[in-house]
Amino acid sequence: MKTIIATVVLSLISTMTMAQTQETKGKVTDENGQPMCCVNVVLLSLPDSTFVTGATTDANGQFTLTSTNRNSLLRLTSIGYETICMPVSQFGGSVQMHENSQTITEVTVKGILPKTRLTGNSLVTTIDGTVLGQSGSAKEMLAKVPGMMQNGDNLEVIGKGSPVIYINGRLMQDADELKRLRSEEIKDVEVINNPGAQYSATVTSVVRIRTKKRQGEGFGFDAEVSNRQNLAYGQSDPGINTNMRYRHNNFEVFGGINWWNYTSVNDSELQQWSYMKQNGNMLCTEQASQLRNDWVGHGLNSHIGFDWMLAENHSVGMRIDRNDVLNTHTEFDQTTDMKQYLLDSSSLLTHDINSNHQHGKVSQPFSWSSNAYYNGRVGKLGIDFNVDFMTSKSNQTDDIEEITNGISSTMSSSNASSAHMIADKLVFTYPLWRGQLSVGEEMSHVSRQEEYNVVGMPITNSSSKVKEDNIAAFAEYACMIPKVGSFSAGLRFEHVGMRYNNLLDPSKSMTRKTDDFFPSLSWAQQWGSLQTSLSYSIKTNRPNYQFLSESMIYINPYSRQQGDPKLDNEKKQELGLNLRWKWMLLGASYERIDNCLTQWSYIYNDEGVILIKSINMDVPVRNLVMYVNASPTWGRFSPNWTIGFQKPDMRQTLADPREASGTRDISYTRPIFFVNLNNTLRLPHSWQIENYFQWQSQGEAMNFRLRNNTATLNFTVQKCWLKNDALCLRASINDVLQRSDQNVTLDCGYYTLNQLSHSNNHTFTLSLRYAFNATNSKYRGTGAGESQKSRLKDK
């Protein structure tokens, strides 16, 4: 009887509690109707405004709050947006936030001021309505985003290297897509400098680009014609890009075609010294080489896809990309003056003059990639599922004519490779306590086969096949604790199984399996205008498949190159700090890398031939990076200035036969300083003038020494016409000073290399773009297997 009474009492208490509990859930969007992530949403009791509970919106802009207090006030805040307060009783389930407009001397400059806010361990920069939204291509624009910089022709997150890039949640697989995407189409950019457990353990930085969602239906298109003229070498690179889309109700179909022509010239001077003992004497082999490699090609990239919103919280879509290389060839010329002499007496033993001309052709029979996704929500449970497929094949042939001391010979080589990948990624999200729990899995299967055949060369043929399976599971929890801050903790487990088959010599085949855990932690807090974040993570870096290839590449009679299938993975520990106050940003990161991947040079045989080989370093590499960014707006002038340094710390003991002990200690601790100055002046009648200056000092990085300062100066003028600047003409001249050549030294003890590379960036580019009824893609695929795709593409 007591049990029955107790059960009844507990049931009544539970019923009363449920009756008093109120659940408030909704969705937050911006002025363009796009979901807003990471908005702080809190409930305050009335009339004293005491904190009751709080949460942050997820990637879909949704939140859920539970409270027993019916008389509450709902408050929503986000940096750069107006605060919203309303009684819970008046909340209709959705709310739209509006950006703050700032006034300077009674002139409204909304639409000019770039806004960057610190959200956890990421920097979110508004592009739409700012000068950054009128910066030409997405590639040009990203170089001006706080936390990023341009290094030669590559984009980097400062201190993190090249990032993995997503466009509307879809993993970008073709780097040239940034040249085709216009800054006018972009809403905001998120730079994540310490990605959490949801990303592959090889990913050290992420850039997420979100395009604008414009209202309306029907047909829209944009087209661009451009020409890039190389002022130093004379080549011309025209290009045509078109994008089309049709939207009706909740269904959208889209596609695009891009025809490109590209030329590249690599012009460098190379000096090499190697030392070895021979018959009790110190033999020195000295090489002085002039190299020039001309790459000429054109191709056609195309894509087609659809996005279908089945219901309010359910979307599916698919995108297929094809990349055709229609005609590509290379012309490589090398002249080498080789001397061998005894170091002590300078007695000349051998003197050869070698010239080498290679004519190469590259064909790509096929290169396809696709992504399909489902994104939805069932009750409070969020679901994000992606499947990716990628397949490619390429063939390269080289005909070589070599003349040594007047004696000519001919050689040839052929390289055929194919790669296939399939991957999936599933992520569940669920609100829990004051935050959100994310759990998921990611799997990929990669197969790559390569065959390298030579005729007339002093090396052997090779044929290999690599298969790799990657299975990952992860969990991450993020929450906000009032007056303490926002916390995120994640753990990722990755199992990698790799099978290397040497098809010509099975005894050299090998199997390797690794199982690793990768934790990540972050904390963020705001005090008034000061925002802070601190993060820690463990990452890895796996060698790309070219590094694993045992194929020996013939360079000249005195040099060879080869990979190593026995390479280990790197292990990275990273600690990051960000501080933001108004328009000032301080970024700092420290990392330690074990088993660092690099290239090393060895004495290959008794004749002094050099073998350049991929290796793991046997000492840790440490790096400290610090920078300060300022992005104010003074009237129509919007500068974006960054100054900082990167300081390595690596110490080695090198084998050096010139030393009595046979070894020599060496250290790399000299910092590299850098300055990036982006300046934009917005003038009446849709005129815009841009100036970019970059300076980098001498210094050291890993096991390389940069021996000279470099400077780059670019200018751009842009003029737009018609409604919403639909027609834009843009002219740019790059590397005006022509002071961006790089002089690099590599010291391996018994071998030293010095290379002076001449810049290929002195160009003039002219582009004209027209957009009609532009409605941006709603594609929401997030992609899977991003690390495997990048390793397949790395050369």
Where are these regions (language model features)?
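Short, acidic, small-residue-rich periplasmic hinge/interaction motif at the N-terminus
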Residues: 40-44, 77-81, 91-131, 150-152, ...
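Short, acidic Ser/Thr/Gly-rich low-complexity loop/linker segments typical of extracellular
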Residues: 47-62
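Short acidic/polar hinge/loop motifs at secondary-structure boundaries
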Residues: 66, 144, 170-196
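N-terminal periplasmic accessory domains that precede
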Residues: 91-98, 106, 138-141, 175-176, ...
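Extracytoplasmic beta-strand/coil segments of soluble accessory domains associated
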Residues: 139-171, 210
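Face-selective signature of the C-terminal outer-membrane beta-barrel domain
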Residues: 299-327, 354, 358-502, 524-531, ...
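Outer membrane beta-barrel strand-and-loop segments of large Gram-negative receptors
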Residues: 421-425, 472-474, 568, 574, ...
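Outer-membrane beta-barrel signature, preferentially recognizing the C-terminal barrel domain
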Residues: 466-468, 509-512, 540-594, 612-625, ...
